[in-house]
Design a protein with these regions (language model features):
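Structured C-terminal subdomain patch of bacterial secreted/periplasmic proteins
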Residues: 141-142, 149, 158, 172, ...
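Bacterial Sec-exported substrate-binding components of ABC uptake systems
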Residues: 3, 11-54, 155-185, 245, ...
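Short helix-initiation/N-cap motifs at beta->coil->alpha
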Residues: 34-36, 87-98, 219-230
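Flexible loop/hinge segments that line or gate small-molecule binding clefts
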Residues: 79-81, 114-146, 150, 278
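Alpha-helical, coiled-coil/dimerization segments enriched in small aliphatic residues
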Residues: 75, 194-224
């Protein structure tokens, strides 16, 4: 059925469908996505489908219309009112190809973390796809730029960026330039790791001048986490420990108990003794907060410096 839909859609695709890396002469817009793919849009898209929650908010920021959207499943995540009646194509982790095709999109905006295979399937049928990553604050601003360009609302995107910059900078200015030493531990039911400055929470910590104990790790530039070691944690002895997680809360608690709290060395850590171990909410620190970036930065800053920053 899927193959038939793809062939049918390819057969009736308009002649001016966007091409990847084709001629940009007279094009409405030419955009390079986070794969390095050059996407040429001959005309302004009229039926845009967005496949992740954070990217939905970027579209809403420039008042962009949608023909389809991802389902909002994450705890406490909110769907912009503008998109309540827009057909959903499934959750970000399990988007339905059939539902995307049913929206008859002339542009799909997808997540680099989840939609590589789906993007390839859509592109085989000459449906243009922008694949974007959203990890750091710089990603947030770049995505705003791109989506503003898609909708022809570059000025609105720039205005929103300026608003975000001002809010984030105000928080950073309110905390010490030489920040406390922190560890950001990520737990899933199967493993425990330590987050790098390239992760969502790590990027925020860096903007708050916090010293990430994993900041000196050598990586390929794309890695956001490295293996956890209690020995390394004890040696670094951070002032504050943040916990992020993904998966069933019962299974995660079991993993944390087995790999972290069950180790006698855990109790010797300065952060543990001082009661400075904090669980970070999924809506801000597992998923990129997007336009709520200032709220997320303020949340972290308040945990570390409650006397200086209020949520």
């Amino acid at each position: 059925i899927v193959a038939f839909c793809l062939l049918a859609l390819a057969g009736c695709a308009p002649q001016n469908a966007a091409t990847q890396g084709g001629s940009s002469s007279g094009a409405y817009a030419v955009v390079t996505d986070d794969r390095g793919t050059v996407v040429t849009l001959p005309e302004k898209p009229q039926r845009v489908v967005v496949l992740s929650t954070s990217l939905l908010n970027f579209a809403a920021a420039v008042d962009g219309d949608l023909a389809g959207r991802s389902a909002v499943k994450a705890e406490d995540a909110s769907l912009p009112a503008k998109y309540q009646a827009v057909p959903d194509v499934g959750p970000v982790y399990n988007v339905s190809l059939e539902k995307v095709l049913a929206c008859q999109p002339d542009l799909v905006i997808a997540s680099a973390d989840h939609h590589a295979k789906l993007a390839a399937q859509l592109e085989e049928s000459h449906i243009p796809v922008l694949v974007l990553k959203t990890k750091t604050y710089d990603d947030v601003k770049r995505n705003l730029d791109i989506i503003g360009k898609v909708y022809g609302k570059e000025d609105a995107a720039k205005a929103k960026e300026a608003e975000l910059d001002q809010a984030v900078q105000a928080i950073a200015d309110a905390v010490p330039a030489q920040g406390k030493r922190v560890a950001i531990i990520h737990a899933t039911p199967s493993s425990v790791s330590v987050e790098l400055p390239s992760s969502i929470a790590g990027d925020m910590a860096q903007r708050l001048h916090l010293q990430n104990i994993a900041g000196g790790a050598s990586t390929d530039g794309q890695t956001t986490r490295i293996p956890y070691s209690m020995e390394s944690l004890v040696q670094a002895d951070p002032d504050v420990i943040f916990l992020t997680s993904m998966g069933s809360s019962d299974k995660i608690e079991k993993r944390i108990q087995e790999d972290i709290k069950g180790n006698p060395a855990w109790a010797s850590l300065s952060a543990v003794k001082a009661g400075r171990v904090y669980v970070l909410p999924e809506k801000y620190f597992l998923l990129n907060p997007g336009l709520d970036y200032p709220k997320a930065v303020a949340y972290m800053a308040h945990l570390v410096y409650p006397e200086s920053v209020h949520e």
